[in-house]
Regions:
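PLP-dependent class I/II
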Residues: 2-12, 22-52, 84-398
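Conserved N-terminal alpha-helix of the aminotransferase class I/II PLP-enzyme fold
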Residues: 54, 61-99
């Protein structure tokens, strides 16, 4: 048995289920879940129609590398979205379709880490739990960079010692952040690329929330964009992860891609030739339709903007909470312990949120998730408004 499995922490939702044991919420109140980041807006009908249309491809094995048409569409989307030089991305070398970013983010560490060198995998804290699990099962030690209000919820990369960077083989960043919604600016991304060059590590940039943002004039910047502006048109040591789950409300499609450094992509393709399933062909054709359309993405953003505005109008007077730059999460500070808050809110108002400490670890003398909760505004607008009113009543009775 793999001994590294013993190092894995219980998953946040396992902890959450245990926390709620013994509570009996009021039966007259319908349950509203703000805990899970699963999009609830309608999937684009034209994408679903294309997938059904292509069901005859079930008789064919898909290629790990994916359809050329899909890789070309992804190149076009990246080039337009992040203002990359025309033809700087080669669909044969720089793009690899994957079954959603969760699987790819985990597998990437298994392919990149040399466990014989006492490696570190550096990651934000709090974080998407896959980063830590991937590091541990690859035989690496996670190194946590706290993100707090004092740092604008961005890791203080300047506080990392040279000795730590020397041991770093892989840096996970998440921009926009989960759960904070904070966006790493382009100058910081450029400095990270310089550090990767100096200390010889790879940057894995999780950008799956990049298309959900508040200001239509300020879309979040990306790692490839920073590399391009530096003249790094080969995207050396830079790899980005994108998905249709949040962008297009297609979490069940399990469709995403990895893009960047051609040498790294080639090694990852070799790994995936042995491990992982290729994306079904009908999913790939549906993905081509999704990546090729922006109107449904704009419409999706508008729905989230409406929910943020409505919910914050209700909660801001009674809760320490700010509108994030991007993502669909609120990350408020709680007036009581985050576990106590979560359990009592469920028991009294039949609303589920996620304690912040379940998404973070103790590091450098603190736990940055303590006394915060994650609220995912994924439910319909009316449900989000109802949830906000119940949370306000709950807070007024504390």
């Amino acid at each position: 048995m793999n001994r590294q499995l013993d190092k894995l922490h219980p998953y946040p939702f396992e902890k959450l289920n245990h926390l709620k044991v013994g509570t009996t919420p009021p039966v007259e109140l319908s349950h509203i879940a703000l805990s899970i980041g699963e999009p609830k807006h309608d999937s684009p009908a034209f994408v679903v129609e294309e997938m059904v249309k292509q069901l005859n491809t079930l008789s064919n094995y898909p290629l790990t590398k994916g359809l050329p048409e899909l890789r070309q569409t992804i190149c076009q989307w990246l080039t337009q979205r992040f203002s990359l030089p025309k033809n700087s991305l080669d669909p044969e070398q720089h793009i690899l379709p994957v079954n959603g970013t969760r699987e790819a983010l985990f597998a990437f560490a298994q392919a990149m880490i040399d466990a014989t060198l006492t490696p570190l995998v550096v990651m934000p804290n709090p974080f998407y739990q896959i980063y830590e699990g991937a590091a541990l099962l690859a035989g690496a030690e996670p190194y946590y960079l706290n993100t707090t209000a004092d740092t604008g919820f961005i890791p203080d990369f300047n506080a990392v010692s040279p000795e730590t960077w020397q041991r770093c083989q892989l840096l996970y960043i998440c921009s926009p952040g989960n759960p904070t919604g904070a966006v790493i600016d382009i100058d910081t991304l450029k400095s990270l690329i310089e550090l990767a060059e100096k200390y010889d590590f790879v940057i894995a940039s999780d950008e799956c929330y990049s298309e959900i943002y508040q200001d239509e004039t300020k879309p979040p910047v990306g790692l490839l964009q920073a590399a391009s502006e530096m003249g790094n048109h080969d995207y050396k040591r830079c790899v980005v992860f994108h998905s249709l789950s949040k962008r297009s409300n297609l979490p069940g499609l399990r469709s995403g891609f990895v893009a960047g450094d051609a040498e790294v992509i080639a090694k990852f393709l070799k790994y995936r030739t042995y491990h992982g399933c290729a994306m079904p062909v009908h999913h790939q054709y549906a993905s081509i339709k999704a990546w090729g359309d922006e109107q449904h993405v704009k419409d999706n953003r508008l729905l989230y903007q409406q929910k943020f505005n409505a919910v914050l109008d209700i909660l801001s007077p009674v809760l320490n909470v700010q509108k994030p730059d991007a993502s669909f999460y609120l990350w408020p500070q709680t007036p009581v312990d985050d576990e106590t808050f979560t359990r009592a809110l469920f028991a009294q108002q039949h609303i589920t949120v996620l304690p912040g400490r379940y998404l973070s670890r103790d590091a450098q003398g603190l736990n940055p998730g303590k006394n915060r909760v994650r609220m995912a505004l994924v439910a319909p607008l009316d449900d989000c408004i109802e949830a906000a009113h119940r949370i306000k009543r709950f807070l007024n009775n504390l």
